């Protein structure tokens, strides 16, 4: 099967992120979920963002993400949830061998993180009215996908952010189940 590197969101490597990784493992994939916050988790996006600022901002997150994959094979799928998408896109742009990308609840236009590797397919998932994804990232995601048959953008009704994390109050079980179904079908094609 496929080796996936799953970067967590701004609340840290929560039990919900671990559960997501475990579901992908149960489907036969090898999943590495680096802890970029060294064991710290947060109850809100605001608390997590304050921590990110305290360690040097997103530059430090990107540095930690690159360091986390140093000993991994090059041929991996880069996946992320929200802030983790920034890490996934950055690492894939800096390191050869990306097989594919799975971007949950975020997307960053390539001019901000580096070009996505040619030939590596991508799935992008997020809620239509999520203040971060739907109102900021959805348009750049659709622009990125335009004219490409290897990029799929999936939207879900609602406004929750971090809805795929079963350990957070924002979790939407129905939408998260559909994300899992689509991601696992995608990974099975690689």
Descriptions of predicted regions:
Residues 124-126, 156:
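Short beta-strand/loop motif that positions the catalytic acidic residue
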Residues 1-73, 164:
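Serine-hydrolase catalytic machinery in alpha/beta-hydrolase-like enzymes
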Residues 117-122, 147-150:
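Short, proline-enriched alpha-helix->beta-strand connector loops that line the catalytic pocket
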Residues 80-84, 88:
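Gly/Ala-rich beta-loop-alpha elbow adjacent to hydrolase catalytic centers
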Residues 78-80, 104:
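Short beta-strand immediately N-terminal to the catalytic nucleophile in serine-hydrolase-like folds
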Residues 150-190:
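C-terminal catalytic histidine-bearing segment of alpha/beta-hydrolase fold enzymes
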Residues 96-107:
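A conserved short beta-strand
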Residues 129-134:
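Acidic catalytic loop of the alpha/beta-hydrolase fold
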């Amino acid at each position: 099967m496929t080796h996936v590197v799953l970067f967590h969101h701004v609340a840290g490597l929560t039990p919900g992120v671990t559960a997501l990784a475990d579901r992908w493992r149960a489907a036969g994939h090898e999943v590495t979920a680096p802890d970029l916050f060294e064991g710290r988790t947060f109850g809100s996006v605001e608390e997590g963002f304050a921590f990110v600022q305290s360690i040097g901002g997103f530059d430090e997150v990107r540095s930690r993400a690159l360091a986390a994959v140093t000993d991994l094979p090059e041929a991996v799928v880069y996946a992320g949830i929200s802030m983790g998408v920034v890490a996934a896109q950055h690492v894939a742009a800096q390191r050869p061998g990306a097989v594919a990308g799975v971007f949950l609840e975020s997307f960053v236009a390539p001019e901000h993180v580096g070009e996505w590797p040619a030939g590596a397919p991508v799935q992008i998932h997020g809620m239509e009215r999520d203040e971060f994804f739907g109102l900021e990232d959805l348009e750049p995601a659709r622009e990125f996908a335009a004219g490409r048959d290897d990029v799929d953008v999936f939207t879900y009704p609602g406004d929750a952010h971090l809805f795929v994390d079963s350990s957070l109050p924002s979790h939407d079980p129905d939408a998260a189940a559909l994300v899992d179904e689509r991601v696992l079908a995608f990974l099975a094609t690689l």
